[in-house]
Amino acid sequence: MVNVPKTRKTYCKGRECRKHSQHKVTQYKAGKSSLFAQGKRRYDRKQSGFGGQTKPVFHKKAKTTKKVVLRLECVVCKTKAQLALKRCKHFELGGDKKQKGQALQF
């Protein structure tokens, strides 16, 4: 269980700052993939018509988790940076701090 606070004071690479300042933390989420990327256009063209599946479908998945990526936005200059954390099964943003001697809760 990884619990990350919603704000953190860290170095800002922005041209105005270039010093440690407060950052707002959110979790990175991949955007919607474009239908007009060259590979997708080629794939759709190949798939159309008769003949079933034309390219191999990947089945040998090895990983059970993904790396968590944090998106840090500077409060002063609004510059965004990304920071990758280690792999974890449970990730929490701004959760309660854990007390000593209490059971884990998901």
Swiss-Prot record:
Protein name: Large ribosomal subunit protein eL42P
Miscellaneous comment text of the record: Cycloheximide sensitive type.
Record keyword Ribosomal protein present: yes
Disulphide bridges: none
Annotated gene: L41P1A
Protein origin, superkingdom: Eukaryota
GO CC annotation, single: ribosome
Keyword Ribonucleoprotein: yes
Matches recorded under PROSITE patterns: RIBOSOMAL_L44E
Single GO term (MF): structural constituent of ribosome
Gene3D superfamilies referenced in this protein's UniProt entry, alphabetically: 3.10.450.80
Family: Belongs to the eukaryotic ribosomal protein eL42 family.
GO BP terms: translation
InterPro entries: Ribosomal_eL44 (IPR000552), Ribosomal_LSU_eL42 (IPR053708), Ribosomal_zn-bd (IPR011332)
Annotated keywords: Ribonucleoprotein, Ribosomal protein
